[in-house]
Amino acid sequence: MNKIFKVIWNPATGNYTVTSETAKSRGKKSGRSKLLISALVAGGMLSSFGALANAGNDNGQGVDYGSGSAGDGWVAIGKGAKANTFMNTSGSSTAVGYDAIAEGQYSSAIGSKTHAIGGASMAFGVSAISEGDRSIALGASSYSLGQYSMALGRYSKALGKLSIAMGDSSKAEGANAIALGNATKATEIMSIALGDTANASKAYSMALGASSVASEENAIAIGAETEAAENATAIGNNAKAKGTNSMAMGFGSLADKVNTIALGNGSQALADNAIAIGQGNKADGVDAIALGNGSQSRGLNTIALGTASNATGDKSLALGSNSSANGINSVALGADSIADLDNTVSVGNSSLKRKIVNVKNGAIKSDSYDAINGSQLYAISDSVAKRLGGGAAVDVDDGTVTAPTYNLKNGSKNNVGAALAVLDENTLQWDQTKGKYSAAHGTSSPTASVITDVADGTISASSKDAVNGSQLKATNDDVEANTANIATNTSNIATNTANIATNTTNITNLTDSVGDLQADALLWNETKKAFSAAHGQDTTSKITNVKDADLTADSTDAVNGSQLKTTNDAVATNTTNIANNTSNIATNTTNISNLTETVTNLGEDALKWDKDNGVFTAAHGTETTSKITNVKDGDLTTGSTDAVNGSQLKTTNDAVATNTTNIATNTTNISNLTETVTNLGEDALKWDKDNGVFTAAHGNNTASKITNILDGTVTATSSDAINGSQLYDLSSNIATYFGGNASVNTDGVFTGPTYKIGETNYYNVGDALAAINSSFSTSLGDALLWDATAGKFSAKHGTNGDASVITDVADGEISDSSSDAVNGSQLHGVSSYVVDALGGGAEVNADGTITAPTYTIANADYDNVGDALNAIDTTLDDALLWDADAGENGAFSAAHGKDKTASVITNVANGAISAASSDAINGSQLYTTNKYIADALGGDAEVNADGTITAPTYTIANAEYNNVGDALDALDDNALLWDETANGGAGAYNASHDGKASIITNVANGSISEDSTDAVNGSQLNATNMMIEQNTQIINQLAGNTDATYIQENGAGINYVRTNDDGLAFNDASAQGVGATAIGYNSVAKGDSSVAIGQGSYSDVDTGIALGSSSVSSRVIAKGSRDTSITENGVVIGYDTTDGELLGALSIGDDGKYRQIINVADGSEAHDAVTVRQLQNAIGAVATTPTKYFHANSTEEDSLAVGTDSLAMGAKTIVNGDKGIGIGYGAYVDANALNGIAIGSNAQVIHVNSIAIGNGSTTTRGAQTNYTAYNMDAPQNSVGEFSVGSADGQRQITNVAAGSADTDAVNVGQLKVTDAQVSQNTQSITNLDNRVTNLDSRVTNIENGIGDIVTTGSTKYFKTNTDGVDASAQGKDSVAIGSGSIAAADNSVALGTGSVATEENTISVGSSTNQRRITNVAAGKNATDAVNVAQLKSSEAGGVRYDTKADGSIDYSNITLGGGNGGTTRISNVSAGVNNNDVVNYAQLKQSVQETKQYTDQRMVEMDNKLSKTESKLSGGIASAMAMTGLPQAYTPGASMASIGGGTYNGESAVALGVSMVSANGRWVYKLQGSTNSQGEYSAALGAGIQW
């Protein structure tokens, strides 16, 4: 049955005691202690009957960490426990456990030394700390710093907002970070680390798996020992994504570089942008892709697709299992294919071949590299036939091209070469060797021929026209007319000579420029009304082998180079605008010879007279030197007045001598020219007036070859002649196309093909094909069969007989014995060759046909060779042809038209100009020659539009002369001449004029040197005189007073510098060092850049200065530094000479010899010298303010800092201990007091790590180990002692802030709170019910006893009967009654023998070993009355008891309320529970539910936000997936597609871009996709597939 009881406080035992329900009790009053007692009572009611409520000491306290009065909702249980009271119950906190502190609002600190700082935070476990608002720290030494953070596990730390750290030593440092597992770390925002020692150290990083590492932002590492870099993803054990933006998926996969992807176990992507997908594959090159198990792509931009595929060459592609692309830019297609060579495509290997079928028509153009099929080759053959013209066609039976027929005036020809050979004989041809047209004519031994009827060519600087004989005759007449009056103008002759030399060189060089004759006729240009020598790509060309033309007034013959060379040579030796004098070259030669002699005689002495200025001008004469000697080369320009020296004149004379020789040669050449022109006509290309064409007939031959024809341009607009080699090449190409040993002989004869079918030979394609048809007539199935109707093999196939392509045809052998089929690429090559041969803009079309050429003949267009050749034959009317009647031997005639009038030959290239040249000369050459002559003459001579030269004008002494002779005569009168009698017979130039001395002006500055013999002019002499005058003044200024008396009195020297050496032996100063300066008697500056000033001064170190007599600078300043220090011997001044460049020392004395530096201004900069005044002021300042904020004023003994790293401040202060500090008068730190600090006058520290502060303070015990501290059960340790006084004098420590931590000092305010609490507790204890139990009976007994004592002890009502010891009342107001009774405590009562009262305000009726009953106690009524047993029994009757077991013993584990009848019972006035096993009241439950609801609501809101964000991100991801799913892809084989797509889902949107490609055979499909969504996230996908 149940026992009824109740729990009351027992002050004697200091705990709650179970008693009868009838027992009376008084409440324990202290702040919230009533609630606490109620809780304990409730807890007692829930515990077994008779147990003591010993859950812990009730030493907790409420603390208001804010301001104002305390609330009443706090709970603090445990010694040192503290709970913040706050202002109201809603903010109260709970602290349960030893030194537990619940500081934050709503906070809970449960466990020893737990500390809940944040609002609504929870700290569970030894030393757990929850500092962040609403944070949770669960586990020993766990720590939650961030707001809403959770730290679960020993030493776990959640430092960031909303962070979670779960696991031993786990650490979530960033906001929203999660660290789950032993020693995991999530360092920055949004980072996640899951697994033993996982580490996510950067923002948004994720490390999932044991020892996984996500070391950079946005890194994801999933799997044991994975690693991921910035924006990288590593999935799979030991997967490593080390490159930025890389991805590694699969066991041991490695993405080592930027933007790499490695997917598959052991896959490796080792270079930037590389992709490796498959088992054990490797992408080792930049931008490489390896797809397939064991595949490898090692080169730049390589792709390896397929098992064990290998792409090693840069930009190579290996597609198919075991395929290998080793060459650069190579492609290996198909399994086992090998591409070893650069820039190749392989579809097999040396033993495995594949066909390429279904080839579409390839583009056929100059830059096309498409494959060609059979139909295209046939189309090209047909096109060739059409372009050949002349009736050529494709044989419908055998596909060959029939020979063309070209009908020419000289017969029909069946190939282009033969037709061109006929045309070659009588046209003016290009000499390819000489690079010009050749007028040579004849077949066996062609000779030079005259070109007649040449119209006057334009004569200008830009003219390329041929000039005729009459034009050259006019030029020669001008030369003859200008010959007589050649004068002796030295300067002009010098210029003329130089130009002649240049002209001669140019003429000589022109001889070597003769080229080969081009294979084109010289044709009439209707637009320009002249023959045009344009050739090939050049607009102008030379005409060579031109026979000397007839040089008469009415001649229209073309002149050759030798004729013009003769003329030019004559012109070169004569000057222009010479008065009409001589009629023949012989006279000219005589005059030039006379001129040479005159110039030679005049040149020796010709210093010329300037009559306007009345002076000689210094133009120099000949080669010898005189008084005006070694004259520097004068400026040889038009305006120059410089004198010329002998070497310059020598050059001129040599040139004149050369001119004389050239003139004689030219005379001969001109004479020979007439004869040559007379004999020119024999070999010219003649005009056949009967047939209206130029004819190549020569001599007795009716037909002659025109050789040396350069390859003519073969285009639609070309009118070039075609030579034999071109025709031979064309025939050879056609023969090559025929095959069957078809060939072209060296004479152009075409040998037909021979085709062997079986054992029979066939000599044309038709018969050969017919034989082939017979051999296949019995073939069946899919064979290529002969179509008898069509007369050819038919590629028709299938029931409908559709035309089919014959594909995969390998390159057929091209040789005279080959019978291989050729493929499209070969046909394209043939077509290209044919197009090149045809020229005329012919092109190979995309379908293999050839676009017809266009040949322009006489401004008409022709689209085939036959028509073009016919046109050329017809247009020979406009060709430059051979005229057999011209001259004695015939000549090419430029006569044209019905009346055969002379015509201009235009576009004539520059002919060679030499003695042996027979080239035609064009107008520009003649103009150039005349221009050279005009330039050589000077005097503003110019070439007129008709080729003549205007006369020059020479101004000499202000008179004008129009020819060289008159000019030289004018010079002779006024020249500065050589006087052989002057200079004592040694000879000299004489400047006298008209017998009077004259000035020589315009003399250039002569060279002034020791070996110069140049004349100097007035300006130079004036400058010298001025310099002498200046130097005289400077010398006077420097020397000062040079009077002997002055020097004797003041010393020798210069202005302002004097030395008096009277009585001293001469001993000069010595500056021995480089850059050194020594001033003063016997001064020595030995060091480089050193200075010694003063008698006997000496400086022997570099840059040193010895200033003053006998001063010595010999010490080198070394770089170094030291600190200022204080020793027992005084202060050691520090220095630092390392902060700049060190120069030599300045010495003003010597060792043992000193000087004062007086009158020194106060220094102002860091390195200025200071004066005594400054030093005195500084010392004074040190005495008063030695250091800012530090002052000392004492005359006592100095301080001593003896210990290492010690500090001593204050008079007589001594610090002997290492690292000690002593501050104040007489402060002392003992040598044994390591780290001791003594602050204050006579403060002493004699213990390690101890501190004494204040006057006379002394440490007494120092550090202690395992000492017994007051009110502490466990032994304690200290590191040192802090003393603020001594045994003889103590100090108050005032203004102490309230302590909060376990080891903080507490102030009186805190102690008062404690005292108040103690007072309340004392009062409560005094009034407790259990202290007055049975008190009435006890008092009655006491009264009776007192009465007995009196009665027996002379007091009526008080008697004693004892011989024991006296009672002792020791406490104030105490009472001791009975033998040996002791009332030790204040206000205590010891009643009865041996009774002991040791507690204040108590009554004791016994001792701890001898107790007494208090009987006959009346029932208590008041709150402080004692209760008797009857009352207790009555109280117990309504109390709650523990249940009993079957054996009758108490069942402490069960309590049944309500009598066990099935009803319920309400327990009212239940105090709030504080311990784990305490019952909670409705208020606590309601508050807990509210807080749980609030926390749950908050977390749900947060979770909802996270879910909302997650939902948004997921929706964005789904939208991205939808956008990428919606991307269309290429589907046609060989096609590629770039696509864009969009997607939206649940309010989020995304856009995607994609690129896809289908392989040429349609089997492989590649896709690369990327997307971005409205959440700002990016995604990418890569795929490849094969279909069959």
Curated annotation (Swiss-Prot):
Keywords: Cell outer membrane, Membrane, Protein transport, Signal, Transmembrane, Transmembrane beta strand, Transport
UniProt KW Plastid keyword: no
TM region positions: 1534-1544, 1548-1558, 1567-1573, 1577-1588
InterPro entries per the UniProt record, alphabetical: Adhesin_Head_dom, Coiled_stalk_dom, ESPR, Pilin-like, Serralysin-like_metalloprot_C, YadA_C
GO terms (BP aspect): protein transport
Residue segments, region Translocator domain: 1500-1588
Description of what induces expression: Expression is negatively regulated by H-NS.
Record has Transmembrane as a keyword: yes
UniProt GO cellular component terms: cell outer membrane; cell surface
Start and end residues of each stretch annotated as Surface exposed passenger domain: 54-1499
UniProt signal peptide: 1-53
Gene3D superfamilies: 1.20.5.170, 1.20.5.2280, 2.60.40.4050, 4.10.80.270, 6.10.250.2030, 6.10.250.2040, GSPII I/J protein-like, Serralysin-like metalloprotease, C-terminal
Subcellular location: Cell surface; Cell outer membrane
Superkingdom field: Bacteria
UniProt-listed CDD domains: LbR_YadA-like (cd12820)
Family: Belongs to the autotransporter-2 (AT-2) (TC 1.B.40) family.
Function per UniProt: Mediates aggregation, biofilm formation and adhesion to a range of extracellular matrix (ECM) proteins, such as fibronectin, fibrinogen, laminin and collagen types I, II, III, and V. Mediates adhesion to intestinal epithelial cells.
Assembly: Homotrimer.
Domain notes per entry: The signal peptide, cleaved at the inner membrane, guides the autotransporter protein to the periplasmic space. Then, insertion of the C-terminal translocator domain in the outer membrane forms a hydrophilic pore for the translocation of the passenger domain to the bacterial cell surface.
Protein name, as recorded: Autotransporter adhesin EhaG
Gene that encodes it: ehaG
